[in-house]
From Swiss-Prot:
Role this protein plays: Fluoride-specific ion channel. Important for reducing fluoride concentration in the cell, thus reducing its toxicity.
Organism: Xanthomonas oryzae pv. oryzae (strain KACC10331 / KXO85)
Its membrane topology: Multi-pass membrane protein
Keywords: Cell inner membrane, Cell membrane, Ion channel, Ion transport, Membrane, Metal-binding, Sodium, Transmembrane, Transmembrane helix, Transport
Listed name of the protein: Fluoride-specific ion channel FluC
Ligand binding (Na(+)): G109, S112
Highest classification ranks of the organism: Bacteria, Pseudomonadati, Pseudomonadota, Gammaproteobacteria, Lysobacterales
GO molecular function annotations of the record: fluoride channel activity; metal ion binding
Amino acid sequence: MRIATSYEMCAQCCCAAAKFADTLQTKPRRSHVTPIYTIAAISLGASLGALARYGLGLALNAIFPPLPIGTLAANLIAAYVVGVTIAYVGTVPGLSPLWRLFMITGLAGGLSTFSTFTAELFSLLREGRLGMSAGMLGLHVGGSLALLMLGMLTIGLLRKSSLGIAE
């Protein structure tokens, strides 16, 4: 039951993020990007990201307790989101700057968790588990870099494919 609940929570967060993204205009009026809209975009993204991170922890950390997979998944997904967003936002002229703030500063920032990763790494080091610590460090840092690049590549491939993404 607990796993189903966390999956549902992640799905609801993703749906809410998609609905908010649909409301962002592709040709913003100057008045559209006000401090209150900026705060709202970042806050909503961060809230959804943090809830998704919590859900991933509930769903995945019990699978292999020596390595908190939920934290790893959160960091890797956040890196992918950043890569997709950088590639997409950089090629769509006139896209509201709120989109980037919502996705990168808010959603990916709330989803990724350097502090939790650091605490888990410290715990492994304190237990003398140097091999597991090195593996965890490599997975988080190397995996995040790889998924950021994969996110950017995804947008590039979608643009070239018959599926396409609107320019």
